[in-house]
Amino acid sequence: MDLLERLGLGGRRVLILHHDDLGLTHAQNGAYQALGLPTGSVMVPGAWASGVKGEDLGVHLVLTSEWPAPRMRPLTEGESLRDEAGYFPESLEALWRKARAEEVERELKAQIQAAAKLFSPTHLDAHQGAVLRPDLAEVYLRLAEAYRLVPLVPESLEGLGVPPPFLPELERLLYETPFPQVRFLDPYGLPPEERLGFYLDLAHLPPGLYYLVHHSALPTPEGRALPDWPTREADYFALSHPEVRRVLAEFHPLTWRAVREALF
């Protein structure tokens, strides 16, 4: 029996609406509180991780730090996870070229354990999909099982930028995992002016389990220190729009906490 059948939601349109990058800035945290949508994940190495309070929070596992500021450092001493200045690598390519799986495992454990001191985590996901190198994906799924947290597992790898050499092993892991798989939706790459239309078009989706990630941030000087601030503000304004709220109300809302209770 699949997850939706187990939850009595078979044949329904079900949506996990997920707020990424919490803990990164006050603007990100403020948008989470202002929108009143419960599900999101926290970047534990972020400066403002301790300021996030909510009912359905996960760990947004960090292995890269791509912005000029703020930069983030590992919680552990793994040399393969640091650049010359001691920060996480700036790109997935740099991470995947250098990272040792045993050091990644220690770092992810440290982030999960630190998160548990701040809130009661329900789920795991990874910033920039950093665990899509197959050996790191195995670590990610193993830690999810060990800590009884639900991992984000996409139904398809299409459009996620996975290097072709990684695909066969990742597809095997997807096939074998006991965790539920979701239809992954992420408007991050769309121009900000197209964001509202993207959310309104959700009205046309067929039944299924959807995971929609957004990066909403308040319009503040601090939030605008990030180079991608227009896309973050576009998410915030779109999700505040009454017509978008009407479209979202047509879905059955689901939290990772409810999924976790069903699985564990």
Curated annotation (Swiss-Prot):
Keyword tags:
Carbohydrate metabolism, Hydrolase, Magnesium, Metal-binding, Plasmid
Source organism, top-level taxon: Bacteria
The active-site annotation reads D20 (proton acceptor), H215 (proton donor)
| GO terms, biological process | carbohydrate metabolic process
Residues holding Mg(2+): D21, H60, H127
In alphabetical order, the GO MF annotations are: hydrolase activity; magnesium ion binding
Pfam families xrefs: YdjC
Cofactor(s) recorded for this entry are: Mg(2+)
Which ranges form a coiled coil? none
Oligomeric state and partners? Homodimer.
Q: Any idea what this protein is called?
A: Carbohydrate deacetylase
